[in-house]
């Protein structure tokens, strides 16, 4: 199939933010009384919003997940992202190449909050290529694995979801792209990324890349 647009996830696809965000979250959960390891924290929260796991957090900490706690999390997370964030290897070149090939018909469709997504894309120099085609699941009726954010992104680039290629690194994200009616490719660098190739394929990815350099060839 010849694709007419590419819709990118952000975290773990364009920017290497997950270890940073997970580190802050793990530290704060331990401070709140949940003795969770970094590995378990990544497994539980990858591809999800913190608030979507509020019941689990409250069960382990014995206290409600408050707006004040979330505000502190955002502040600490953003400070570390500003200081440490880097682009995924090869993501910059891939975005430039597909942007040129597709006449700018690319979008970023993230499950994260808009401030985080826009800040990250600015920091790694990719924001100009997405311009006003940046979408946050926080602003949709439902976030990933619901298809809403991908449906909004497809509408913004003026391409039917069935003619869009989605790039995702988590099972939750792959499910969202599939539910939108798009073709989804996974990204799982070696050693294994945030979703194993097997798990991404089981969720509906038709192909799993280990290198962003593969993306241009997948356009058809």
What are these regions (language model features)?
Residues 46-80, 89, 97, 105:
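A metal-dependent, Asp-based hydrolase signature
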Residues 14, 87, 106, 166-167:
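Conserved SAM-binding loop
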Residues 22, 26, 50-55, 70, ...:
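An amphipathic alpha-helix signature
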Residues 79-108, 114, 118:
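Short, acidic loop-to-helix structural element flanking the phosphoryl-transfer center
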Residues 1-43, 60:
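Active-site neighborhood of HAD-like aspartate-dependent phosphohydrolases
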């Amino acid at each position: 199939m010849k694709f007419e647009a590419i819709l990118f996830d952000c975290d773990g696809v364009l920017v290497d933010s997950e270890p940073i965000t997970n580190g802050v979250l793990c530290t704060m959960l331990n401070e709140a009384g949940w003795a969770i390891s970094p590995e378990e924290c990544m497994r539980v929260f990858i591809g999800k919003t913190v608030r979507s796991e509020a019941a689990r957090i409250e069960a382990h900490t014995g206290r409600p997940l408050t707006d004040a706690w979330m505000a502190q999390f955002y502040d600490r997370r953003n400070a570390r992202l500003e200081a440490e964030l880097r682009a995924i290897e090869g993501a910059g070149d891939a975005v430039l190449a597909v942007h040129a090939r597709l006449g700018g018909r690319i979008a970023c469709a993230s499950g994260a909050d808009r401030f985080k997504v826009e800040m990250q894309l600015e920091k790694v120099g990719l924001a100009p290529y997405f311009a006003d085609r940046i979408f946050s699941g926080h602003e949709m009726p439902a976030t990933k694995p619901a298809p809403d954010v991908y449906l909004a992104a497809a509408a913004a680039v003026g391409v039917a979801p069935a003619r869009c290629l989605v790039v995702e690194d988590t099972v939750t994200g792959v499910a969202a792209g599939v539910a939108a009616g798009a073709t989804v490719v996974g990204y799982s660098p070696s050693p294994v990324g945030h979703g194993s190739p097997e798990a991404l394929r089981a969720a509906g990815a038709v192909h799993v890349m280990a290198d962003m350099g593969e993306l241009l060839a997948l356009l058809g």
